[in-house]
Amino acid sequence: MKNSSQKEPSIFNLAVVVAALGYFVDVYDLLLFGIIRVPSLASLGLTPDQVKADGEIILQWQMWGLLIGGIVSGIIGDKRGRLSVLFGSIVLYSLANIANGFVETVEQYKWVRFVAGLGLAGELGAGITLVSEIVPKAKRGVATSLVAGIGLTGAVLAYFMKELFDWRTCYFIGGGLGILLLLLRISVFESGLYNQVKTTSVSRGNFLSFFSSADRFKRYILGILIGLPTWFVIGILVTFSNDFAREFGIQDKIDPGKAIMYAYAAISIGDILIGLLSQYLQSRRKALFIFYGITIAFMIAYFTMLWGGSAAQLYWICAGLGFGTGFWAIFVTMGAEQFGTNLRATAATTIPNMVRGMLAIFILPLFKWFERQPSIGYVDAGIYTGLIIMAITVVAAALTRETFHKD
């Protein structure tokens, strides 16, 4: 097979296709716990209150795995090559998901989700980095948005698997999909740009480099902060939509797995459209601000229009929230483009996983802190957390460099 540098760049080349399929499996496994959280924990003998409390703990452990795994896989990706991460990560999370089908206690559950998080961390960043280096800059936003748009439908598949099979079988299916992807991934080739970096004396994959320069540190932190709304929306508003529904007085039974499915179906559409929008505007930042506005509009709808509402209303508002936060690939691409090829995989892998990890270390703890205050209830805790998240994000985006024309 020819090296990627000898091929005519296209948004439909092998790297883009395999990255999209890889992200599809990644999202299936990443969101599966949120989708089957209630039935799986209930089958272990937990009460509804324990399902809520232990579900939050297990989710935090998974996100800690993503946070740590993102750092490790980013460094390995730059030092040993993208393929080492793409192969290693898929083996780890495939085996973890198969093991997840055998858990019998909450303790086992949280440890297996932690290991799965370690593996899942490497999938999107390494794939997006390969795509961003192979596809020319004029088509890069569209290509990465296609990867995310196709990949995010993995959550839709996870929901329908949950409807058709027992929760343990759903985990076995996730592991099986990973193994099938591993066989396909043999054909993936390394990025030509990255191969050029291997021959230079530039330091590759030094995670501490982000902290050795004030300018690099600023770019790195801003890259994380512009993505915060995604996991506030998915990790709090959508995943725990059944708990919010009780507070809103919704009488219909709410399936948080269905809410996640609605959200991710819309996210996949948003992720493709934002790529086209950024192409039309010739700006990633302008497209990002438009989608922030959509997110804020549906947050307002979530907290004002659902009191005494119906399940259908909640699901459609979750879809609107999903569409508004359909900027995942664009923000990951912006993060990768802030740095040279020597640090691009480290940035592209650690930044999105730092955002995912922020659910465990900042977003969920902030939400729980507000909830514990005597004069603040569950819904108000969500409102205050959302206000803080969006304020931080908008300021960060305003301070972030435009990267659309950066090679």
Regions found by a protein language model. Name each.
Residues G34, R216-S268, A360-I363:
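Extracytoplasmic gate region of multi-pass secondary transporters
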Residues I36-I68:
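Extracellular/periplasmic helix-loop-helix junction of adjacent transmembrane segments
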Residues I68-E104:
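Conserved MFS/SLC helix-loop-helix module at the cytosolic interface between two early adjacent transmembrane helices
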Residues G70-G81, D271-S283:
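Helix-to-loop junctions at the C-terminal end of transmembrane segments
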Residues K79-S89, Y280-Y292:
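Cytoplasmic membrane-interface "Motif A"-like loop-to-helix N-cap segments
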Residues G81, F102-Q108, Q282, M305-G308:
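Helix-breaking motifs and short loop linkers at transmembrane-helix boundaries and internal kinks
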Residues V112-G149:
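Cytoplasmic helix-loop-helix junction between adjacent transmembrane helices
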Residues V147-I186:
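Helix-loop-helix hairpin linking two adjacent transmembrane segments in secondary transporters
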